[in-house]
Amino acid sequence: MNIGRAIKVTQAVVDIKFEGELPKIFNALKSKLKYKDKELVLEVSQHIGDNIVRCIAMDSTDGMSRGDEFVDTGAPISVPIGRSTLGRIFNVVGELIDECGPLKGKYNLEPIHRAPPSFTEQRIQEEVLVTGIKVIDLLAPYLKGGKIGLFGGAGVGKTVLIMELINNIAKAHKGFSVFAGVGERTREGNDLYHEMITSNVININEHEKSQAVLVYGQMNEPPGARARVALTALTMAEYFRDRENQDVLFFVDNIFRFTQAGSEISALLGRIPSAVGYQPTLATDMGAMQERIASTTSGSITSVQAIYVPADDLTDPAPATTFSHLDATTVLSRQIAEMGIYPAVDPLDSTSQSLSAEIIGEEHYNVASEVKRILQTYKSLQDIIAILGMDELSDEDKIIVDRARKIQKFLSQPFHVAEIFTGMPGKFVSLSDTVSSFKGIVEGKYDHLPEAAFYMVGNIDEAIKKAELIQAEAK
């Protein structure tokens, strides 16, 4: 047993002196004493000479003192993987924090530091991941194994969108989801857990029937936990991709806090900061995690990463480094939410690299381009409408405005996870239905239908039925 003693404690950074063999970089050290009834786990970060290793604490160092003994585990932090993790909440070191008893069933332990898939393992076929959400599938489609940035303020429906994606992936693709709460508010994490129980994404009576795993490193935890919790969650997601051949959804909220935690650690380790005070290894840290999110010959991990932009400055090194890894962006707009259109995705601001004829096909590409053109024209005409009114527009512009308003309404959709709040049954719309429905609208086939018929429906057949009901009620 290789035992070392603490010789210096500086908040989240601890120096440990070993008499025998030095532990390797990234090895986990466990305390022999318990602090607040828990073992403290440290991760070796630097060898600084004189048989001393500098470590990052994964929990609070309150109550620790010089001379306390730590045991080298001989391996990196290792966390449970397997189906038994479904429906449970873990912390950064793989301990359960949901107070629902121990893990049931088989599971293995895997280290959180792993190499990304090799070139030969990676799948180069570009395949669209159908989410069943019209606005995403039509205008900013997700690729299997892609990375999506989710931008949205408080109260615009980010959590509901995340939960609907989890629900649809589970039902349509029989896939699982892993959620990493990085620097989350504890209240938000608690709310998400209870909302998942309400919407049957998590089954607390039979955990094996759940569709998601939650891993939390909350805002009140030391930077070590916040910097590693995304890797813990990613390790659990890799199991479903590599061993169960699944298409996994991996959520990170918030990727900025992952960078922020790395910056705090870097300063405590005494590294010279780079631009705007960030760690000099910012690009390396980000790349090490993002490269593990990929499609392989076994399955795929598609990540949706919520991104906070400091002071709305997109050139800040943290969001700028993240952008270089993204394949698509989904922007939630408060203006659209205020109009009562949910999901409140901005169709003109959201982008996707897969929106090209080679990947999604000629028909889909042409329909998406025409929808964007109509919406953009409507946006540019809004000032004229506000000042002079609709009567001053040309006949052609009036038709465009009418179609744009129908498209805007048709981009709304009732969600399965919101059924209990709205009373409307949720709709999963297939990609072919989405494309053909919007094709009909832009070609003018449904110009005779009232605008209200397009609001909160699935495909165009439902809009036609709704129009018939509206006309029947009017009589």
UniProtKB/Swiss-Prot annotation:
One cellular component term from this protein's GO annotations in UniProt: plasma membrane
Enzyme class: translocase
Family matches, as InterPro entries: AAA+_ATPase, ATP-synt_VA_C, ATP_synth_F1_bsu, ATPase_a/bsu_AS, ATPase_alpha/beta_chains, ATPase_F1/V1/A1_a/bsu_N, ATPase_F1/V1/A1_a/bsu_N_sf, ATPase_F1/V1/A1_a/bsu_nucl-bd
Membrane topology reported for the UniProt record: Peripheral membrane protein
A molecular-function term among this protein's GO annotations: proton-transporting ATP synthase activity, rotational mechanism
Binding site for ATP: 152-159
Keyword Membrane: yes
Enzyme Commission code(s) on record: 7.1.2.2
Protein location: Cell membrane
Keywords: ATP synthesis, ATP-binding, Cell membrane, CF(1), Hydrogen ion transport, Ion transport, Membrane, Nucleotide-binding, Translocase, Transport
Catalytic activity as recorded in UniProt: ATP + H2O + 4 H(+)(in) = ADP + phosphate + 5 H(+)(out)
A Pfam family reported for this protein in Swiss-Prot or TrEMBL: ATP-synt_VA_C
Subunit structure as annotated in this protein's UniProt entry: F-type ATPases have 2 components, CF(1) - the catalytic core - and CF(0) - the membrane proton channel. CF(1) has five subunits: alpha(3), beta(3), gamma(1), delta(1), epsilon(1). CF(0) has three main subunits: a(1), b(2) and c(9-12). The alpha and beta chains form an alternating ring which encloses part of the gamma chain. CF(1) is attached to CF(0) by a central stalk formed by the gamma and epsilon chains, while a peripheral stalk is formed by the delta and b chains.
UniProt-listed NCBIfam families: atpD (TIGR01039)
PANTHER family attached to this UniProt entry: ATP SYNTHASE, ATP SYNTHASE SUBUNIT BETA, MITOCHONDRIAL
The family this protein is said to belong to: Belongs to the ATPase alpha/beta chains family.
Function of the molecule: Produces ATP from ADP in the presence of a proton gradient across the membrane. The catalytic sites are hosted primarily by the beta subunits.
Name of the protein in its database record: ATP synthase subunit beta
Native source organism of the sequence: Wolbachia pipientis wMel
Lineage summary: Bacteria, Pseudomonadati, Pseudomonadota, Alphaproteobacteria, Rickettsiales
